[in-house]
């Protein structure tokens, strides 16, 4: 049995509130828990998540390190520099 007067009050039906609406109940040491985001309105869990990657990662890598189409243009430029010298 727990010692009296040292443990916080336990609320077995504490309300979890998001945007003024009770979304669930749980056990807690506070009677009400106010949250900004929960699984019912988070974009990841609702399926409304938008992917902002407009450029493919592989294409970006190829362009950055000169592989693929951008690399061939760079090689032509180097060959032209040698002809000018």
Curated annotation (Swiss-Prot):
InterPro entries, per database record: Ribosomal_bL28/bL31-like_sf, Ribosomal_bL31, Ribosomal_bL31_A, Ribosomal_bL31_sf
GO MF annotation, one: rRNA binding
Region of interest (Disordered), ranges: 65-85
GO biological process, one term: translation
SUPFAM superfamilies: L28p-like
Keyword Lipoprotein set for record: no
Compositional bias of kind Basic and acidic residues: 73-85
Protein keywords: Ribonucleoprotein, Ribosomal protein, RNA-binding, rRNA-binding
Xref: HAMAP family: Ribosomal_bL31_1 (MF_00501)
Protein role: Binds the 23S rRNA.
Name of the featured protein: Large ribosomal subunit protein bL31
Organism name: Synechococcus sp. (strain WH7803)
Recorded name of the encoding gene: rpmE
């Amino acid at each position: 049995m727990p010692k009296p007067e040292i443990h916080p009050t336990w609320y077995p039906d504490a309300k979890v509130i998001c945007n003024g609406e009770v979304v669930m109940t749980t056990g807690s040491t506070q009677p009400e828990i106010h949250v900004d985001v929960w699984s019912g309105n988070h974009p990841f869990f609702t399926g409304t998540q938008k992917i902002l990657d407009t450029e493919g990662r592989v294409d970006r890598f190829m362009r950055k390190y000169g592989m693929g189409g951008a690399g061939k243009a760079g090689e032509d430029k180097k060959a032209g520099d040698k002809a000018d010298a």
